[in-house]
Amino acid sequence: NAIRKSSASEMINIAVGSRRFRVTIETEGGHSYNAFGNRNAIAYMASMIDALYTIKPPTGTSYNVGVIQGGTSVNTIAQKAEMLYEFRSDRMDAMEQMQAHFDACVSFYRQKGVRIEVEVLGERPCTGDVDAVEQQKMMDKANQAYQDYFGCEAQFGSGSTDCNIPLSRGIPSLCLACYNG
């Protein structure tokens, strides 16, 4: 069979977008005894992560710091720390709200004189302004074909698939039976 049932939603009709960043903080650091009181990149990074986690995300939105690293030894005030941060949503306004919160956190720490570099690692768009009537027509046709083939109703849901690009540009799209995870 070219089409198979998957354990997730069989038809993806809503695109979940994501933005991913590497954030690097650099400070003067120094020896933990002789330079005590110097700024610690890890402490600033921990504080920034705490600030990022203060937002109550909109419905259908998530965020995560998945990796953090930094420092060189137990007796060295960390000069550098990095984290990988992402947020995801199936709504454009929520993506912009999350971006504004991220930008505000970065700006706050830059104003403290901390050197911060932000590298965009990836950006996948979410659903844009899709004509609801045309999208529904496509879903109805696909659902009928699904019923004819499998003998049951299709399950519609959201996910990150090849449909992200057309859906983000307002083009009605579906991803059929090839999404798992």
Locations of the language-model features?
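Structural element of the ATP-grasp superfamily
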Residues: 23, 45, 142, 165-166
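Residue-level recognition of short, structured coil/turn motifs
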Residues: 57, 147-151
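Residue-level marker of alpha-helix boundaries and capping positions
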Residues: 96, 133, 153-154
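Zn-dependent metallopeptidase/amidohydrolase metal-coordination segment
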Residues: 68, 152-181
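Short, low-order "capping/linker" segments at domain edges
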Residues: 127-145
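Midchain, well-structured core segments that form catalytic/ion-binding scaffolds
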Residues: 1-128, 157
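Anion (oxyanion) recognition and catalysis
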Residues: 110, 147, 167
